[in-house]
């Protein structure tokens, strides 16, 4: 796509208020207008009648849901038609001067930087250590200072020589959460009702325990509330979180039922299909929904594997444990993209397959739904996996290539496709979506962002050959390992060490993958809305010369959490 065409129609965003020093933690709450029948005001939470806000949990009446801080700053900034950088105003070209020396220019619509002059800074000036505190479910997360690192997300790390793909990246997604324990697949393209499906397959029969729950009630929201200081960024040891994790688990288990979710059972083949929530239930521009969830546990090995061991004149067989992958996902949209369905997508299919994609928002300036191409990629991957069952196993890059060949919509996207074969994780990646493998509370392996430069990721566009673009990974996994796969909406706002700590504490508390994904998505959204906190994105901006930038990057967020478990079959 011609870069001048991409920049057409873009106007600078209104200047943002200068970054303030981090003060006392602002209590986050879900506001509702006074006088609305059946909705209780949250104690100590300022509400704004003129914003038309309603509670976004339980049986909400109608109108936009608003997640506000104690001083209501987000509401004051969230004026129709006057979006600042916190709300993702298209400001293509702001960093163009910064990228000229690389021979190209690009910007991320959701994270464009405005009113900041590029200057040269040393790496030591690019980041500062802050002592911060956060919470899971209201309990404090005591975070130490984050050591400086040269592996800052958003900075140029992987450049494919001779490749020019698409346009610069990013915006929104439809609000979804999916986690399933199933014998088939789950698809996160549209909004879901919260549910849980567990199926164990033995021979020709299937035993199913199904429970459909709903949007988090006010009690559930209180349990999920992240009373985090606006300036949460540096990461170290995390303490006093067990109680908070327990509260979050209880809140999720006590959720009320919602519509929009359909579950179908077919003997040994169980498929979960969910439709999107209605317009009345969605954010009308600036609110935040707690993601809905559904779960799928997929058995990737149908029996015990054996390894032959030779010893002089005899041969014996050593039985290896059968491992399965339990995966769950959650999504939240960029507030300005809810009504168009968002631009993130993902899929979870049985036999250990999953993936995420992040459509490039710049296509919307040409009248194209930027999320269609990403959704077609994920649909195509799921279709290829389902059609190949019983045939020789396909490689991840082959699945992606088949999906890309069948995609019909114009567009471009970052994409990651992964498969766990019972012992080894195989993954292929294009762009700045990525994964972390967490073992015993530590980051064991991770992918590298593939970018042309700051905030300008590599992308696959319709007609491109994925084999020339992908970066491939093979990682041996063991029982208890966790995989966090996500679009850059997570990694730009939440430090990797914090993600690892959340995974560790959540698994100790027995939370499901979808519940962990929910918390990570809500955490990323919270940091993305802050104009003052330190984040991986602000670190990257400072590192390339945007002196004075602070805060997160408001974006659509998609997270898939997968846990390696021993099969009970």
Curated annotation (Swiss-Prot):
Residues 174-183 have a biased composition (Low complexity). The gene is BIPP2C1. The keyword Disulfide bond does not apply. Its cofactor is Mg(2+); Mn(2+). It catalyses: O-phospho-L-seryl-[protein] + H2O = L-seryl-[protein] + phosphate; O-phospho-L-threonyl-[protein] + H2O = L-threonyl-[protein] + phosphate. Residues 166-212, 251-279 are annotated as: Disordered. Mn(2+) 1 binds at residues 358-359. SUPFAM superfamilies: PP2C-like. Pfam families: PP2C_2. One of its GO terms (molecular function) is protein serine/threonine phosphatase activity. Induction: By salicylic acid (SA), benzothiadiazole (BTH), hydrogen peroxide, abscisic acid (ABA), wounding, salt, cold and osmotic stresses. SMART domains: PP2C_SIG, PP2Cc. Mn(2+) 2 binds at residues 358, 488, 555. May play a role in responses to biotic and abiotic stresses. Residues 329-564 form the PPM-type phosphatase domain. It comes from Oryza sativa subsp. indica (Rice). Keywords: Hydrolase, Magnesium, Manganese, Metal-binding, Protein phosphatase. Its EC number is 3.1.3.16. Belongs to the PP2C family. This is Probable protein phosphatase 2C BIPP2C1. Binds 2 magnesium or manganese ions per subunit.
């Amino acid at each position: 796509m011609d870069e001048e065409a991409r920049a057409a129609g873009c106007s600078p965003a209104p200047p943002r208020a200068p970054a303030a020093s981090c003060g006392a933690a602002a209590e986050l709450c879900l506001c509702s207008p006074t006088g609305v029948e059946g909705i209780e005001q949250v104690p100590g939470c300022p509400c704004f009648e003129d914003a038309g806000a309603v509670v976004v949990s339980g049986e909400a009446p109608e109108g936009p849901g608003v997640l506000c801080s104690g001083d209501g700053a987000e509401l004051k900034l969230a004026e129709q038609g006057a979006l600042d950088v916190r709300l993702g105003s298209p400001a293509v070209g702001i960093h163009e001067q910064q990228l000229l020396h690389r021979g190209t220019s690009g910007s991320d619509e959701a994270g464009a930087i405005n009113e900041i002059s590029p200057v040269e800074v040393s790496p030591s000036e690019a980041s500062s250590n802050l002592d911060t505190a956060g919470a899971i479910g209201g309990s404090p997360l005591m975070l130490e200072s984050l050591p400086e690192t040269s592996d800052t997300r958003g900075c140029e790390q992987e450049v494919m020589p001779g490749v020019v793909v698409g346009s610069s990246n990013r915006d929104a997604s439809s609000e979804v959460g999916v986690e399933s324990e199933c014998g088939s697949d789950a698809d996160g393209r549209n909004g879901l009702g919260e549910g849980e499906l567990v199926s164990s397959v033995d021979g020709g029969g299937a035993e199913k325990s199904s429970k459909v729950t709903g949007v988090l009630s006010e009690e559930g929201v209180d349990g999920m509330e992240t009373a985090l200081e606006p300036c949460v960024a540096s990461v170290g040891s995390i303490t006093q979180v067990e109680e908070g994790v327990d509260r979050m688990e209880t809140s999720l288990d006590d959720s009320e039922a919602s519509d929009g979710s359909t579950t179908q059972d077919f003997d040994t083949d169980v498929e979960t299909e969910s439709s999107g929530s209605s317009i009345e239930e969605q954010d009308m521009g600036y609110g935040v929904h707690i993601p809905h969830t559904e779960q799928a546990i997929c058995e990737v090995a149908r029996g015990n594997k054996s390894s032959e061991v030779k010893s002089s004149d005899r041969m014996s067989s050593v039985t290896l444990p059968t491992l399965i992958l339990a995966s769950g996902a959650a999504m939240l949209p960029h507030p300005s993209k809810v009504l168009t369905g968002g631009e993130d997508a993902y899929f979870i299919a049985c036999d250990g397959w999953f993936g995420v994609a992040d459509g490039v928002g710049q296509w919307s300036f040409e009248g194209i739904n930027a999320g269609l191409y990403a959704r077609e990629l994920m649909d195509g991957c799921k279709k290829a996996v389902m059609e190949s069952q019983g045939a020789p196993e396909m490689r991840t890059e082959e699945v992606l290539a088949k999906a890309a060949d069948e995609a019909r919509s114009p567009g471009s996207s970052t994409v990651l496709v992964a498969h766990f074969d019972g012992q080894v994780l195989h993954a292929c990646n294009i762009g700045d979506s990525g994964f972390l493998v967490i073992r015993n509370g530590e980051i064991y392996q991770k992918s590298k962002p593939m970018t042309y430069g700051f905030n300008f990721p590599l992308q696959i566009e319709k007609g491109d050959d994925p084999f020339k673009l992908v970066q491939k990974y093979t990682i041996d996994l063991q029982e208890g390992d966790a995989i966090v796969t996500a679009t850059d909406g997570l990694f730009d706002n939440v430090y990797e060490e914090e993600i690892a700590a959340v995974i560790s504490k959540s698994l100790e508390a027995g939370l499901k993958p979808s519940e962990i994904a929910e918390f990570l998505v809500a955490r990323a959204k919270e940091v993305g809305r802050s104009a003052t906190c330190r984040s991986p994105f602000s670190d990257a901006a400072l590192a390339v010369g945007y002196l004075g930038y602070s805060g997160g990057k408001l974006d659509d967020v998609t997270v898939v959490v997968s846990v390696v478990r021993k099969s009970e079959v």
